[in-house]
Curated annotation (Swiss-Prot):
Its cofactor is NAD(+). The active site is at 146 (proton acceptor). Its EC number is 5.1.3.2. This is UDP-glucose 4-epimerase. Keywords: Carbohydrate metabolism, Galactose metabolism, Isomerase, NAD. Pathway: Carbohydrate metabolism; galactose metabolism. It is an enzyme of class 5 (isomerase). NAD(+) binds at residues 11-12, 31-36, 56-57, 77-81, 146, 150. It comes from the Bacteria.
Length: 313
């Protein structure tokens, strides 16, 4: 199968590229390298089934690109990923995450693409939900332009499915972590803690550490993307999480243990807009896609710490 991965040089995108190549698929990777890193694709570049195109989905000739490469399935991970930037500059966020998605959908329609697997956000589209674990049947309640853009992307792609028969599915990951995650961004607390503790730097927890998140390992998320690229789940959003809540304080303790560093974070006032809880119901992904998480948190943390330890040497 011939595939296109947008955001291919990112943390999740590059891991997906490696998985698709390992499964024997041809992959065209598209990324403008504004946040993704070329080094994430070093392994992929050794494959004769991989081609890389440096381009921005907002202004690239997507119609020409898709006509040339003729992918059967598009995995759409290219995005503006900073919630803070979306709040500071909503038009920019919408340009990338909404207009970019619509441009891709239109090019896919014209090229006869079978399916687009779109990246939504299990951690933000529900806002503060009325129940935990949170299922896809809960109303969306975006609390940021970033979340609103993800919902808009879903709506547009579902419209393309209904009007033009361009199939789509939406992967809504919980808090993804693992090797290649950016330790310098606003999110990615596992990477942030891992790198800081390995370097002997002080770590910060915002709030009292009781906030919880649903942490899911990147390989498990990639498996959900691959499964969603098949015929099942058209037009549906799939929560991809473990269904297990872990507090920030518990997470820090686990990472400090894996590193062999003191478990002594600094505590700072909570940040405006941070959610108190997050826990996703993954029943739909289990039942429709046959997906289930395979990597427990302790194992995933060990793999992540090993990655950053090797990188620092």
């Amino acid at each position: 199968m011939r595939t296109l991965v947008t955001g291919a040089a990112g943390f999740i995108g590059s891991t997906l590229v490696d998985r698709l190549l390992a499964d024997g698929h041809g992959v065209v990777g598209l990324d403008d390298l504004s946040s993704g890193r070329a080094e994430n694709l070093h392994s992929a570049e050794n494959s004769d089934k991989f081609e890389f195109v440096k381009a921005d989905i907002v202004d690239a000739d997507l119609t020409g690109l898709l006509a040339e490469f003729k992918p059967e399935v598009i995995f759409h991970l290219a995005a503006q990923i900073s919630v803070k930037r979306s709040v500071d500059d909503p038009p920019f966020d919408a340009t990338v995450n909404v207009v970019g998605t619509v441009r891709l959908a239109e090019a896919a329609r014209l090229a006869g693409v079978r399916k687009v697997v779109h990246t939504s956000s299990g951690g933000s589209v529900y806002g503060t939900p009325p129940a935990y674990p949170t299922s896809e049947d809960m109303p969306v309640n975006p609390a940021s332009p970033y979340a609103a853009g993800k919902v808009a992307g879903e709506v547009y792609l579902n419209m393309y499915r209904n009007l033009y028969d361009l199939d789509c599915s939406h992967i809504a990951p919980a808090n993804v972590y693992g090797p290649r995650q950016d330790p310098h961004g606003e999110a990615g607390v596992v990477a942030i803690f891992s790198e800081a503790l390995l370097a002997g730097r002080t770590t910060k927890i915002f709030g009292d550490g009781s906030d919880t998140r649903d942490y899911v390992f990147v390989d498990d998320v990639v498996d959900a993307f691959v499964r969603a690229g098949g015929p099942a789940g058209g037009g549906q959003r799939f929560n991809v999480g473990t269904g297990v809540e872990t507090s920030t304080r518990e997470l820090h303790t686990a990472i400090a243990g894996a590193v062999g560093a003191p478990d002594e974070p600094e505590f700072h006032p909570p940040r405006l807009g941070d959610l108190r809880r997050s826990r996703l119901d993954n029943t739909r992904a289990r039942e429709v896609l046959g997906w289930q998480p395979q990597v427990a948190l302790a194992e995933g943390i060990a793999k992540t710490v090993e990655f950053f330890r090797n990188k620092s040497q």
